[in-house]
């Protein structure tokens, strides 16, 4: 099987790969998932390393027999803020105006983070601090989950943070370290039957 995960947002992009029309297995784009295809115990290839792959790989890695991720350009993978909210936090959100205030704080945080990626005079220091923080965090995660040094180097983006969509995930890198998961960084020349 080959699952193409190289699309962009709501308009799926299927790359033109030599030999794709000769592939005899099931092949579909993640934006048009074919739920009739059984992948349990099968060899599956995922093309692309963006947000779709970061969701698909952890979701199916424990289900398939062997998974190969055909990785393209390195991506900025940042921690996803997944956590359970305690009873006090849930209760506070029921108070009038609190939900709106929390939403305003969240928007403000993301607006500040966005500004940090811009090169406005006077904000270069903030930008450097934010980028250094995320670079250090990604390097730590790569060191933790990716044993192969060459792959670690390939997975560290060589472009500025914020140039491409960030990938928030706590499951992607651990999934790539599973025994049944391989990462191929050699590039795809052709698909064979």
How should each PLM-predicted stretch be described?
Residues 36, 160, 181-193:
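A conserved short coil-to-beta-strand element within the FAD-binding core of flavoproteins
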Residues 130-134, 138, 147, 151, ...:
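Alpha-helical structural motif
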Residues 150-152, 171-173, 186-192:
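Internal nucleotide-binding/catalytic subdomain
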């Amino acid at each position: 099987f080959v699952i193409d995960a190289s699309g962009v947002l709501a308009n799926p992009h299927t790359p033109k790969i030599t030999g794709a029309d000769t592939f005899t297995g099931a092949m579909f784009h993640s934006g048009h998932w074919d739920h009739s295809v059984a992948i349990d115990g099968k060899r599956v290839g995922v093309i692309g390393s963006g947000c779709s792959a970061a969701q698909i790989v952890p979701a199916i890695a424990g289900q398939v027999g062997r998974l190969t991720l055909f990785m393209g350009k390195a991506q900025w993978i940042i921690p996803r803020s997944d956590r359970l909210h305690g009873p006090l936090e849930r209760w506070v959100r029921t108070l009038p105006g609190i939900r709106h205030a929390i939403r305003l704080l969240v928007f403000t945080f993301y607006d500040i983070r966005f500004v940090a990626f811009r090169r406005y005079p006077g904000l270069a220091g903030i930008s450097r601090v934010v980028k250094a923080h995320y670079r250090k965090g990604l390097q730590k995660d790569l060191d933790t989950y990716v044993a192969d040094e060459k792959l670690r180097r390939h997975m560290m983006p060589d472009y500025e943070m914020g140039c491409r969509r960030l990938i928030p995930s706590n499951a992607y890198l651990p999934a790539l370290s599973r025994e049944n998961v391989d990462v191929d960084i050699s590039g795809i020349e052709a698909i064979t039957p």
